[in-house]
Amino acid sequence: MAKAEHTSTAKPSKPAAPERVAAFRTGLSAEARAAALLIAKGYRILAKRFRTPHGEIDIIARKRDLVTFVEVKARASLDDAAYAVTPRQQQRIIDAAQAWLMTHPEHAEFELRFDAILVAPRSLPRHLIAAFDAST
């Protein structure tokens, strides 16, 4: 009696491309540096990497009656990082912030702000306060 062969139609998963893994690790490191900067400035981190179908917010932090939604950008230079937050990305962050506020109504009356923290090798992170606003 012949033994039946089992063939799988599922493709084996490929490991992530080294460039993507490196970019992911760079992003995590930049977010950790940004969170440390915010904590040193007196902020309390409320959430990291908050994801919605509409977008993602890297860090949500609070200081007194202010909630700030922070986009972290890591690039080869701080100038390159400064230009990396596009209007489309800003809108996605604003949409994600609205989703977060719907699930955290206790913060709805707080002052809200959209900041960016720029990270580059051999440089201190740069905190751009009110990098953009919800009217853009």
From Swiss-Prot:
InterPro entries associated with the record: Restrct_endonuc-II-like, tRNA_endonuc-like_dom_sf, UPF0102_YraN-like
A Pfam family of this chain: UPF0102
UniProt xrefs under Gene3D superfamilies: 3.40.1350.10
Domain of life: Bacteria
Gene Ontology MF terms in the entry: nucleic acid binding
Family membership noted in the UniProt record: Belongs to the UPF0102 family.
The name this protein goes by in its record: UPF0102 protein BBta_0181
